[in-house]
Regions:
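Phosphate-binding site recognition
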Residues: 1-165
Length: 165
């Protein structure tokens, strides 16, 4: 971990928690809030305007649920969390594509689903996106002993892209 420096770099445009922490960028500690969320609820829908730090927050959740304790050294959550259980994390970011058609979105979802099926296995007889995804969640839990965490970033980008079409 980079030592504390009062003249740390500003993380302009950086949305990866791990990069902020390992490369010495300034980070405003919101990990007490992260701990509160993961300790008190099951599912959350976080809606904020663009550029309000949603991607960074999801990246922080990802590191937390992957058990990357070393990244949280010196932050509030370091003294709050005692278990640091590792969970399977299914992270889907819909930010990078243009979404010219429904088929394009389906192709992206299919690619992610295939990757997760390779990691956690498939169930015979599952054919729809929904049943395949539910099978991945169940298989991930069976394989790891912990429930899967699903993080979806920029969920609204395909909707916004096609809203005026």
């Amino acid at each position: 971990m980079t030592p504390i420096n009062p003249f740390r770099k500003l993380p302009i445009g950086i949305q990866e928690f791990e990069k902020l922490r390992t490369e010495g960028y300034l980070y405003v500690d919101k990990t007490a809030f992260v701990y509160e969320l993961v300790s008190t609820g099951a599912a959350y829908f976080l809606s904020r305007p663009r550029r309000f730090g949603k991607s960074l927050l999801l990246s922080t959740f990802k590191a937390y649920f992957e058990g990357k304790k070393e990244l949280f050294k010196g932050l509030a959550i370091d003294s709050l969390e005692t278990e640091w259980n590792v969970h399977p994390v299914l992270h889907l970011s819909l930010n990078a594509e243009k979404y010219e058609s429904a088929e394009h979105l389906e192709g992206i979802l299919e690619a992610h689903l295939q990757k997760w099926e390779e990691m956690y296995g498939t169930n015979p007889g599952t054919s729809t996106f929904a049943t395949r995804f539910m099978a991945v969640l169940e298989n991930a839990r069976k394989k790891t002993g912990h429930g899967a965490v699903v993080l979806i970033d920029e969920y609204d980008k395909p909707l916004l892209k096609t809203y005026h079409d």
